[in-house]
Amino acid sequence: MEKPDPKVIVAIDAGTVEQARAQINPLTPELCHLKIGSILFTRYGPAFVEELMQKGYRIFLDLKFYDIPQTVAGACRAVAELGVWMMNIHISGGRTMMETVVNALQSITLKEKPLLIGVTILTSLDGSDLKTLGIQEKVPDIVCRMATLAKSAGLDGVVCSAQEAALLRKQFDRNFLLVTPGIRLETDEKGDQKRVMTPRAAIQAGSDYLVIGRPITQSTDPLKALEAIDKDIKTR
C-alpha cells in the first residue's frame, strides 16, 4: 500500500525528546510528514528518527550539510541508509559537492532513496542581510540561479520561500520539488522568518511541500490546526 503524501511537513523544534514527543503525539502521519533538525539529531541521533519512522512518519532530516564534497557525500550516504524520506544540502557548496553527493546516493542500493533538496537562501535572511555579506544581487535572482545549478547537478528540488516559488515554478516543471518554510497563518506573528506566506498562497504560488512549525506545534489543538491547514490547501 502506498504511503500518503501530505503537503505539510511539521517542523519539530524542541530541545528534548520529551518535548518533541509532546509535539508529535497529537499529530498523524496521514496528514503530515515531520522535519527533524540539528538540535534533536545531535542530542538523540538516529534512534529517535527510527522511532518516528516506526510510527509511520516520513522524515525530512534537516541538517543542511555544507563541507568539502567527499565529507558531505559520506554524511548523505549515512542519512540515506537511515531510511529518511528527505534530506538537504547547501547549494552554495558548489556543483562538485552536489554532483558528488548525487553520485554517492546512486551508488547505494536502497528500496527507496531519499529526496535530495538544495538550500538556496535561508528564509531568515533578506536583501539587507546579504548586503552585509558583500552580496549585492537581489534575493530572487540569487535563488533562481542557485536552483538552476541544483537542478543541473541532479538534485530533486530546492528549499525556497513562497515568494521565490512563484518564480521558480515558471522555470521548472513539477518534477523539480519546491519545499517552502516560512509558512505562517494570517493571524500569526512572523517569528524569526522574514520571507513568509500563508499555506494556501504558498501552494498557489507553486510550492510542493510546506514546512510549518509553531502555527501547529504551539496551537492549543495541534491536530485541529493541522486539519484546518490541510483542508485549506486542498480547497485551492
Swiss-Prot record:
MF annotations from Gene Ontology: orotidine-5'-phosphate decarboxylase activity
Main enzyme class: lyase
Disulfides per UniProt: none
Cross-referenced InterPro entries: Aldolase_TIM (IPR013785), OMPdecase (IPR014732), OMPdecase_AS (IPR018089), OMPdecase_bac (IPR047596), OMPdeCOase_dom (IPR001754), RibuloseP-bd_barrel (IPR011060)
Active site per the UniProt annotation: K64
Function: Catalyzes the decarboxylation of orotidine 5'-monophosphate (OMP) to uridine 5'-monophosphate (UMP).
NCBIfam families with a match to the protein in the record: PRK00230.1 (NF001273), pyrF (TIGR01740)
Protein's UniProt name: Orotidine 5'-phosphate decarboxylase
Organism: Coxiella burnetii (strain RSA 493 / Nine Mile phase I)
